[in-house]
Regions:
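Long C-terminal interaction/binding lobes of large macromolecular proteins
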Residues: 121, 125-134
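Short Cys/His-rich "knuckle" micro-motifs
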Residues: 17-22, 48-55
Length: 134
């Protein structure tokens, strides 16, 4: 595995690949998972999950506030396909096209808080339109 350098966007420190226990302690939802954690942790609370196969980061490091915003954006977008409004693939394609993003950048784990707000608003509009059409 090639070593990669990841810098924390909040404090500028280097991030390191660590086991899930560093982030979650004994309560890790997936003890085998890996995370990129800011080298200033716990003073700086930024981290992001790593892809299981490649060990590349799934997105950008995020603090607690941004992680919550990303979670909320996922819940909003996922509601479109979980409620049968469209398929999962269609929901993510909608996200990509509506935001003018290339496929490789259409991942909520890469989004800022403002982009997450766009996802939430977009999802609301589509849920409302589907309800009116029903």
């Amino acid at each position: 595995m090639k070593r990669i350098n990841i810098t924390c966007p909040a404090c500028g420190s280097r991030a390191y690949l660590r086991p899930a226990s560093v982030v979650y302690g004994d309560k890790a939802p997936d003890p085998d998972a890996k995370y990129y954690v800011c080298g200033r942790s716990p003073a700086c609370d930024c981290y992001v999950a790593a892809h299981r196969k490649t060990m590349l980061p799934m997105g950008t490091l995020a603090d607690k506030t941004l992680r919550k915003k990303r979670h909320d954006a996922h819940v909003a977008l996922d509601s479109l396909w979980k409620n049968g409004i469209m398929s999962r693939k269609e929901a993510y394609r909608l996200l990509q096209l509506s935001m003018g993003l290339p496929a490789e950048d259409a991942h909520i784990a890469k989004f800022s808080a403002a982009r997450c707000d766009e996802v939430i608003a977009l999802s609301r509009r589509f849920r409302a339109a589907a309800a009116r059409a029903a």
